[in-house]
Amino acid sequence: MKRNLYFLFAFLFTLTLTTAAQSLVKTVPAKIPDPDLNALKREAVTEVDKMQTLTQQMVDSIFSFSELGFQEYETSKYITGILEKNGFKIERGVAGMPTAWTASYGSGKPVIGFITDIDCIPRASQKPGVAYHDPIIEGAPGHGEGHNSGMAVNTVAAIALKKLMEKNNLKGTIRLYPGVAEELVATKAFFVRAGLFKDLDVMLGSHVSNEFATNYGQPAVNSGLVSVQYNFHGRSAHAAGAPWSGRSALDAVELMNIGWNFRREHLRLQQRSHYVVVNGGDQPNVVPSEASVWYYFRELDYPHIKELFELGNTMAKAAAAMTDTTVDWRVLGSAWPNHFNKTVAEVQQKNIEAVGMPTWDDNDQALAKALQKEIKSKVEGLKDKVTPLDKPKEPQGGGSDDVGDISWNVPMVYLRYPANIPNLPGHSWENAIAMATPIAHKGSLAGAKVQAMTALDFLLNPENVKQAWEYFNTVQTKEIKYQPLIGEKDVPAIELNKEKMGKFAPELKKLYYDPTKYKNYLEQLGIKYPTVKN
């Protein structure tokens, strides 16, 4: 009897423990394993590859729009339509610019930004795939910088990321921005002032190039600038009958330019300054009562840019005093020198090397070599190797890009993706030739893969974000803090290029790419790829 009671007690005790254990298992959820970063990157590449046709269509469509800075209405409508259709929340007209917008998906931290430019170049109209000068519309704007490809890169990357975030329940936010009027260096300082980047953890920029590369620090061939228009006001009179009654605003413009040109000898070698007269009066027999000149003052750092700007103001006031006119000025745009983040660049470089260069075929190389020969540059075709990480070098000065203002407010890099031909002059019809061809399509697809992979590195690894900000705070901005070059009362010059686009838009619209009828823009234009001189 005792033995039976013992076994009964043991059975009940074991049953109680088992029930308690099962209850405990039910109340404590199993730990969800962390996502496999490498597996997600492979999945991102697969998703991007599925959008090869979308990439080509975006590159070709934006090429066909050919819109100048501040007039990118069709371009912005097209891009935001694609993003909205794919579940992104759009905010239009940001920072006081009708063609500016943001597109967001997700919630919470980290917040990863994507930015790339969308405007084109005056007088750069060119038939794609034709290795000599042959404009689509004579005198019209064209994508002679290749900005038509960047939004394909960032949009395709963002859509791929969204799919992965939904599927794998990944936390964080991705947000896209357009580089409006970059060729005027006229908007990103206003974006900063409007607070568009205040919550960003990392910004991933992209820009067309002939190489696959990234860098950190200040690029060797980069300057900051301030863009200023000086407006002189005089008094009109009959230029022959009573010139003594007039006060020539044009005389003031000319004296300012003469004074500046004499002063150049006594400026630092690193400075670059240039001007165009945007209003020289109406006709010779009327003393000009109004005249304007537009200056770019470029230097290597904020103090020297500010110094040039103040010197320009002094020259303008002196010219006004000499001619008994008055002067005022307006800052049209500005750019801090670029400074890119070491941590973000090192992470991005690994992804560039993982993706590798596109595979160019004989037609791609034939176009590249024929164009290089046509313009008498070095004939070497397209690059076939990834560029090693570009480390800081002594700045020498050069072109300017207003992403510099962003780079001094949030850790940022610029992916240079291989969608164009080496050894071209830039800002010209030559640079438009490859930009709606398989060269641009392949390079943009490769760029989208790197953007998506790099975003995953920061979405899934908080340590990367932490290290990026450590570099930003303890190295980049340790001694230099961002100060805007635009004033509190300055506003975006959204009226610029309106007249030029009004002239060419009706003809351009007739030639917008129609992907429902044509496989690509080359087919629509009836261009054999490549078309080269015999």
Task: State where each predicted segment sits.
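Bacterial Sec-dependent N-terminal signal peptides
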Residues: 1-23
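Acidic/His- and Gly-rich active-site-bordering loop/insert found
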Residues: 22-143, 152-172
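Divalent metal-coordination and catalytic microenvironments
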Residues: 62, 83, 103, 114, ...
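Short Gly/Pro-enriched turn/cap motifs at secondary-structure boundaries
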Residues: 92-93, 182, 218-222, 393-398
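Acidic-glycine-rich active-site phosphate/pyrophosphate-binding loop
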Residues: 119-133, 221-231, 420-428
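Histidine/acidic-residue-rich, glycine-tolerant segments that coordinate divalent metal ions
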Residues: 133-142, 148-149, 165-288, 506-519
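Metal-dependent amide/peptide-bond hydrolase catalytic core
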Residues: 254-534
